[in-house]
Each structure stands twice: as structure tokens, then as C-alpha cells.
Amino acid sequence: MKIALRVDASSQIGTGHFMRCLTLADALKAGGAQVRFVSRHMPEHLRGMLVAKGHEFIPIKSSPSGTSDDLPHAAWLGTSQHADARDSLEALSDQTWDWLVVDHYALDARWESLLRKTVKKVMVIDDIADRQHDCDVLLDQNLYADMDTRY
């Protein structure tokens, strides 16, 4: 099974997202999966963790396009969702992926639907429920009384 993970991290935000994706990737790899991380922002010490664990890492280069999206956390992406989708597709274009796991507050259904060109299934990890998703599996690790109507 081939699984790609799209997650960013920095010294200010996203390290928790990275760590939960790394934990998932470790378990998937132990089960025989091929795992690739795709990231626009990733500090060297976190990249080092990926390399040490034998995970593939593809950096997405910075893109000149501005953040024109209407999401509350759009600025965290550093570019538009469309530009990021294009760059992510390029990073994954060498093969077909069984799953894409997305853990990013600045990405929504618009981005996810564009990535369906190269992935069979999409899983989104989201714990703030402030945007729509185009996914096969949505994971919110928190317990809420309104979980049935939250998304």
C-alpha cells in the first residue's frame, strides 16, 4: 500500500500535526506500507526525524502566488490552495497513491478534490470543523457531544 501524508510544521505551529502523522506513518510502515511525506514547511530537525525513521520526504518549494483563500488559517499555507495542490500533485505524480492523509488547517475540499487525480482515497485529520472536506475518511480525535452534526 502506498500512502502519502500532507502536513506542514514550524517552530510556531504544526508540530503536533507532524507528530501525529509521524506516529501514523510509523505504524503504516511497520505494516509494510510505502510512506511519503509532502511538506511546504518543515524544520530541519523534523526532517531529520523522518530520515532517521526511513520515511521518504518531498519538500514543496515556495510558490510566489499569494494566499487568496477565505479560510481562517489560510496564511499558514504560504500560498493559495490551488498553487499548493499543483505543487503537491507534482510531488506525487511519479506513482498512484492508495491513500492521501491530510493534516492541515489551511486546506479544504477545494484542495482535496484537486488531489483526487493522483490518489485513490483521501483521509483528513481535522479537529476544528471550520471548513468543508472532500474525503473518504474524516478523523477528529476529540470527543464532542455534537459529533453527529459537527461536520
Model-derived regions: residue spans:
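Structural motif
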Residues: K2, D98-W99, V137
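Cofactor-binding loop segments of dinucleotide-utilizing enzymes, especially the Rossmann-like FAD-
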Residues: D8, R40, D127
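Conserved nucleotide-sugar phosphate-binding/catalytic loop shared by glycosyltransferases and other
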Residues: A30-R86
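Nucleotide-activated donor-dependent transferases that construct or modify glycoconjugates
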Residues: M1-G14
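Active-site-proximal region of nucleotide-activated glycan assembly enzymes
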Residues: K120-Y151
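Short amphipathic alpha-helix
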Residues: F18-L28
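Short N-terminal targeting/anchoring amphipathic segment
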Residues: L89-A106
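An aromatic- and histidine-rich active-site surface loop
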Residues: Y105-L114
